[in-house]
Amino acid sequence: MEQFHATTIVCVRRGNHVALGGDGQVTLGNIVIKGTVRKIRRLYHDKVLAGFAGATADAFTLQERFEAKLEKHQGHLMRAAVELTRDWRTDRVLRRLEAMLIVADTEHTLVLTGNGDVLEPEHGLAAIGSGGAYAQSAALALLRNTELPPEAIVKQSLEIAGDLCIYTNQNHVIETLGA
């Protein structure tokens, strides 16, 4: 059975100002099932942003578990991420989930992978999903060569990814923290 998948999620940081955005498309094989899915969420009293890519049901499951870890660790992003990925690696059911998360607060941006990795990306930016490489390239160029705020960089990066990746649309949700 084919999985629902494909998206673009991108996160850009300048100091404590961070923006996380994603498109709204969900596909099943080569068919667009829905174009308005919200893949970006605010968690833990609106102090943490999370975005997901991968199989939709798997991503929702991981996001819910991450939110529970955030509550358990009183919003401490790194501890919640490490504990979630530890569970992800050791739990037989979780190990089969096909999804990735980008999570961010005003101090850290982390990528949580299906291999149980917690990665803190360089350059203050991260991107995942089928259009992630396009969005990351665009964001890096804009970050290096402009003074645009993070949300403007995320918006332009998603637009470029949507122009190039057939699994990414132009229906964007962008959330920010700090300023």
Curated annotation (Swiss-Prot):
SUPFAM superfamilies assigned to the protein according to its UniProt record, in alphabetical order: N-terminal nucleophile aminohydrolases (Ntn hydrolases)
GO cellular component: HslUV protease complex; proteasome core complex
Signal peptide stretch: none
Reaction equation(s) it catalyzes: ATP-dependent cleavage of peptide bonds with broad specificity
Family: Belongs to the peptidase T1B family. HslV subfamily.
Assembly information from the UniProt record: A double ring-shaped homohexamer of HslV is capped on each side by a ring-shaped HslU homohexamer. The assembly of the HslU/HslV complex is dependent on binding of ATP.
Function, in words: Protease subunit of a proteasome-like degradation complex believed to be a general protein degrading machinery.
Protein name: ATP-dependent protease subunit HslV
Organism: Bordetella pertussis (strain Tohama I / ATCC BAA-589 / NCTC 13251)
Gene: hslV
